[in-house]
Amino acid sequence: MSGISAQLVKKLRDLTDAGMMDCKKALVEVAGDLQKAIDFLREKGLSKAAKKADRIAAEGVVALEVAPDFKSAMIVEINSETDFVAKNEGFKELVKKTLETIKAHNIHTTEELLKSPLDNKPFEEYLHSQIAVIGENILVRKIAHLKAPSSHIINGYAHSNARVGVLIGIKYDNEKNAPKVVELARNIAMHAAAMKPQVLDCKDFSLDFVKKETLALIAEIEKDNEEAKRLGKPLKNIPTFGSRIELSDEVLAHQKKAFEDELKAQGKPEKIWDKIVPGKMERFIADNTLIDQRLTLLGQFYVMDDKKTIAQVVADCSKEWNDDLKITEYVRFELGEGIEKKAENFAEEVALQMK
C-alpha cells in the first residue's frame, strides 16, 4: 500500500461515500489513479447492486409534489428493503433528486426516468451508485406525472407516514370557483387515501371482474344473513347485480315494471305509484351496486359526510357553486402494494450473502 497517502484515501471517500477500506483497496488495485479508483468502486458497487437486486424492496416512500398553480403534479413510489434505510438522509436526497428529474424532463414512466440525465450521467447510473453507497436494493417502482388542461386543476394528499399518496384532477367551468375546487380535490384525495378505492368509476371495471366479484359478494351476504337469522336481526337483500355497469336501461325498465306490478297486485292506486316507485328504484340501485360502493371513488360514501357518495358530493358542489364539476384524474399509490415481501431469518440472510 506504499505510495497511497491518507489524504488520497480521504479524497476518494469524499467523492464516493464508499468505506475507508474499500477506498484503500481500490487505490492499491489501480496504483493510486483517483479516476480509475472511482471507476473501480463504481464497478464494485454495481456488482453489489446486482446481487441485491433479487431481494424484494418492500419498504420506502410514496412522495408527491403539486405545482403552486395546481396545473401539474407528480407522484412516485421508491422502494427500499428496510424502513430504516427509508429514513436515511441519503435516501431522502435520492427521493428529492428523483422528483426533480421527473419534473425537469417531463417524465411519465420509470423507463424514461432511468435513461434521463442527472449530473451529466444517466439516472440509472446515479441510482446504482446510491444502491452501492446505501447498501440496499432501491427501486423506483411507479411514476405518475399529470398535467391539467385549461379549466382543470390537480391537487393531492400525501399521508404523514409517506406510505400513501393520492392525486385528484377536477374539471370546472367557473374560474372564480378555482380555490374551492382546489380544496375539494384535496379533501377527496384525503378520502381516497383512507378508503382505498381501486378505480375512479365503475366504467373502469371489466364485466368479467364484476361478475366474479358479485359471486363473492353474494356468498358473503348469504353468510352474514345466516348469522343475522340466528340472532333474530334483519336480513340483507341478496343482490342480482354488483355494479352500475350491469344496470342497463332494459334492466332498470324491467325492474320498474316489476315494482309497478307488485303495487298493482297489492291494490295500491296507480296515482300514488310515482311517489313509491322512485324510492324502491333507489333502493334497488343501492343494493345492486355494492361493488361500486366498495371499490370505486365515485361510488364510495364520503368520509366527511357518509350520507353522500363522492359523486353526489361533486354534484352538490356543482349545483351550489353554479358550475359543472367532474373528476377527471385519480391516481393512488400505496407503498409496496402488490409486493409480497420475503420472510428470511438471519441465518438464511448470511447464507445468501456467502453465495
From Swiss-Prot:
Keyword list, A-Z: Cytoplasm, Elongation factor, Protein biosynthesis
SUPFAM superfamilies, per the entry: Elongation factor Ts (EF-Ts), dimerisation domain (SSF54713), UBA-like (SSF46934)
Cysteines engaged in disulfide bonds, as pairs: none
Subcellular location: Cytoplasm
A GO MF label: translation elongation factor activity
Organism domain of life: Bacteria
InterPro entries for the chain: EF-Ts_dimer_sf, Transl_elong_EFTs/EF1B, Transl_elong_EFTs/EF1B_dimer, Transl_elong_Ts_CS, UBA-like_sf
Primary location class: cytoplasm
Coiled-coil residue spans: none
GO biological process, one term: translational elongation
Region annotation (Involved in Mg(2+) ion dislocation from EF-Tu) ranges: 82-85
PANTHER family membership: ELONGATION FACTOR TS (PTHR11741), ELONGATION FACTOR TS, MITOCHONDRIAL (PTHR11741:SF0)
Protein role: Associates with the EF-Tu.GDP complex and induces the exchange of GDP to GTP. It remains bound to the aminoacyl-tRNA.EF-Tu.GTP complex up to the GTP hydrolysis stage on the ribosome.
Membership in a protein family: Belongs to the EF-Ts family.
Record NCBIfam families: tsf (TIGR00116)
HAMAP family in the record: EF_Ts
Protein name: Elongation factor Ts
